[in-house]
Amino acid sequence: LPFLLFLDEEERDGETVLAPGRCVRASDLGLGGNNPEWKFVIHDRTRKGPAVPNGSIGSRYGEEGTWNLEMRDCYDRADLDPVLSYAELGDETEWKLAAFPVFFEGQPSLRKGAVPVRRLAVTGADGKQQERLVTTVFDILAASLAIDRGHGGDVASGYEDARAYATPAWQEAITGVPAEDMIRVAREFADNAERTGGRSMIIMGAGVNHWYNNDVTYRAMISLTTLCGCQGVSGGGWAHYVGQEKVRPLAGWTTVTVGSDWMGPPRLHNGTSFYYFALDSWRHELLSMDKLTPPDRKGSLPDHPADCNALAARLGWLPFYPQFKENSLETCEKAAKAGAASNEEIVAHTLERLKSGDLELSVDAPDDPANVPRVMVFWRANPLGSNVKGHEYFLKYLLGTESSFLGEEARQPETIRTTPEPDSPEGVGGGKLDLMVTSEIRMSTTCVYSDIVLPAAHWYEYHDLSSTDMHPFIHPFNPATDPAWEARTNWDQFKAIAQKFSELAGKHLGVRKDMVATALLHDTPGEIGQPFGEVRDWRRGDAEPVPGKTMFNLKVVERPYPDIYKMYSALGPNVAKPGGVGAKGVSWSCAPEYEQLKARLGVVSEPGVSEGMPRIDNAKDACEIMLALSPESNGDVGVRSWAGLEKQTGFKLNDLSRPVQDQHLTFEGITARPTKGFTSPNWSGIEVHGRTYAPFELNVQRLVPFHTLTGRQHFYMDHEWMRGLGESLPVYRPPLSLAAIGEISGPRIPRTDKDLVLNFLSPHSKWSIHSSYSDNHIMRELSRGGGEIWLNNDDAASAGIADNDWLECFNANGVFMGRAVVSHRIPHGKTYIHHAQERTVNVPLSPLSGTRGGTHNSLTRPLVKPTQMIGGYG
């Protein structure tokens, strides 16, 4: 909150208006040294001027001992006393009106708030000094909330002012929560936090994540708990109880999962962007960024979300695979033919081809036959029956089969080639996939549509590890019986595939060089690649293309394809090297554990690349390796794992692992008794001496910085795109009005006077159990034998709907069929269609589409939000 930011003067309608700008950096003060563009500034009461405290992200890379939250100046080490608000400085302060975006009046609009400001001498890029208006984040936050500080602006007259943004009376019209109830809860929450030292908590489920504006909603909750001093306190803060897996032994799991014990980096893709393009949701995009931005920010980012994603991939913020319009093996071969001998020369040759346009990015033409996915393998996942939004898009574009898709192509992006179209002769000629393989324990919807189904071992037929965000223990899975018939464990299935692949690779591939492009990842030096939050596109000439800084990383990886099976079946040598194991920017060597695993698991005796290395014969061996390499399950590794963080912070921290140094969780040990995970630098909780995990204790109590730009939790985000969308502060943004932008209209969507237009919500599956899901007799009886659609009794009566009637729900994305469940408990204007209602049992024909009646995701499609694409910036 004390950090300083510029107020930018902007001309609007013939008037000069102040708008919150980017944060002030050490470089703005003319200071040099290590990463001054990444060190943030406060106003120090003692020196009566600006200062640069420890803990900013600039101190994390390139120096030692100042990446900590001691309130000292990182240049002269003097103690600091930060000014929270310039209003504290009395007569030395001016008051100005600044404009803030609000989003609850239909179109985004602006309101003014009074902020106290000071004039700061700033050194420009040309070396000349100029005066700029600055204020604190606290003052900006207060002004944005319409708090009347006696200096004018669009302020609230009191809690009962329903016209003013963020008052209790204002929210009542949106949420239905009476203003007096909201005031009571807020006061009790804050009072309890004050009395207990921060032990007030906000608990939420998965619902927030299903909304387009989930990020600002989360930020609002985090801001509330931070203002009340609840972070880093046992029993305080915020927590989401969803049932997601939290991989506590993270470093060991990552090593085995991505094969970093042998080589790297891996290719990892964010699922939302992948499906947005693979399912051609972008061709039917109805959202306009200009319509979502405040009036003063029109044109500050691409209007089409697909153009935003393409720019993010180009600048290295997000991955995009396939990478190029040619095989990445061919990229290295072409470089070699052009005379490139070393890996560095191959990268340089590739970079020149990218600059000239000779080598095209796949994201620039995602429907070109050279750029589409061809093979997909699913295991422990049911994308078509559960989690992938855009079920009918999946059927139409990826599989090329019949679907109930009812949409039309919308406006197209500017920077992405829309040709060839998928159905054209030059396109893929129908579905993009040549092969879809699913490994499953049951005949799920995904299996029904797959080319090959591999029967997998069931829950009680294999070895595995389990750890969740809801308890601190690491649990084992042990087989009660062998897999039935032809079923195999997932580990054994991939082992068999690796064996056959290696056999074929010896004939057809050999050892090849692969050009791997990877995004600028969080917790790596790439996160300080693009200073000031400015969007500088190398293709447009804004900057030189520099891998790892202004664009994605490029690295040549040698692939010994004939040895894949041997590498799969043994633990590679990298884990014994310095920094060979790690996660979240912290790494260490596991040389002692490497030798211990040889004794525990045995060594490979067969000649070849893996000879003499620890064996991985089965899933249990893989679990043993994960436990051995992770500080959360091996106390000796835990003590060692703090060394890198101790250098960065200048603090002694390994005392947090000393009490468990002689403890090593083994698979046999946790089978006898599941055990709590240990404290580690990969997580922010402290779990020594019987303490229960609470996030951010390491940051608040031991002064290890948060992994953010300033090293603190942020109320204000100053990236150009965050300001462009009006989301620098945790503002209220209403749900997207999908009806208003056209999701229930179009030439293929019939409308009648009896139609009900309802807001569709998809709560967690109601009639299912995780071991056998919903398609068994007991669960089917509970759910009336098929899909169900819950709706309000008054809504049902208005359309002549009786309980248990078959209903047809539809929009541009597709059709879902289900029985009406009429209940007064459902809010007016809403419908509940529980998730994971599969199209396997009792799915009738849809009169509208002529196909079977879909799943809950038949009514959805993938959406992408630009604020969640930002990278290279902390």
Regions found by a protein language model. Name each.
Residues 1, 107, 116-118, 122, ...:
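Extended redox/cofactor-interaction regions of prokaryotic respiratory oxidoreductases
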Residues 1-196:
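Long, well-ordered, tryptophan-enriched scaffold segments
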Residues 147, 191, 226-233, 400-404, ...:
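Short, well-ordered loop/turn and helix-capping segments at boundaries between secondary-structure elements
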Residues 188-189, 205-207, 237-248, 511-525, ...:
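A glycine-rich phosphate-binding loop feature that marks nucleotide/adenosyl-phosphate handling sites
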Residues 197-201, 232-239, 409, 507-514:
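Flexible, glycine/charged-enriched surface loops at secondary-structure junctions
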Residues 344, 492-555, 606, 613-615, ...:
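Long, contiguous, secondary-structure-rich segments that constitute the structural scaffold
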Residues 424, 433-435, 441, 480-502, ...:
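Phosphate/diphosphate-binding loops
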Residues 445-477:
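Flexible glycine/proline-rich, aromatic-decorated loop/lid segments
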